[in-house]
């Protein structure tokens, strides 16, 4: 392994906060290229394998679908002839993510207004109660 010793699936799982089952699933569907296995049949994750795990986790956290990631990995494996197509896929996914962020920001602002209204009503109610005790 370049740059260090190979990692077990448990170590990769802990490092990236993914279950071992999730990592196996990602490998099975081709999101992570086939991981080398040692003489005992256990996976030995290289730095490159870990790079794929980290990339997939980041993209999933950003909301990319499994299908979009499968397309991306398939294009990547075809080589440089797919560079523009990969870039286009990432641009498209970025636009979808930007729209989600915009929608979530708007929702957050609405929630803040709603919470402020509750705070205002609570303060008015407290003021009314304190006025009754005088």
Regions found by a protein language model. Name each.
Residues 1-6, 78-134:
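C-terminal regulatory/oligomerization modules of transcriptional regulators
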Residues 1-71:
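Basic helix-turn-helix/winged-helix DNA-binding cores
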Residues 56-57, 73, 94, 98:
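Amphipathic alpha-helical segments within well-ordered protein domains
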Residues 69-80:
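Short, charged, low-complexity amphipathic alpha-helix
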């Amino acid at each position: 392994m370049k740059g260090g010793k190979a990692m077990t699936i448990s170590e990769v799982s802990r490092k990236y906060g993914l279950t071992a089952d999730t990592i196996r699933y990602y490998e099975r569907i081709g999101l992570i290229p086939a991981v080398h296995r040692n003489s005992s049949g256990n996976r030995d994750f290289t730095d490159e394998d870990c790079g794929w795990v980290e990339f997939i986790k980041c993209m999933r956290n950003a909301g990319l679908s499994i299908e979009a990631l499968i397309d991306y990995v398939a294009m990547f494996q075809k080589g440089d002839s797919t560079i523009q197509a990969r870039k286009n896929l990432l641009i498209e996914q970025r636009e979808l993510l930007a729209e989600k962020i915009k929608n979530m920001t708007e929702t957050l602002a609405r929630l803040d207004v709603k919470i402020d209204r509750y705070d205002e009503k609570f303060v008015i109610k407290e003021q009314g109660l304190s006025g009754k005790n005088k």
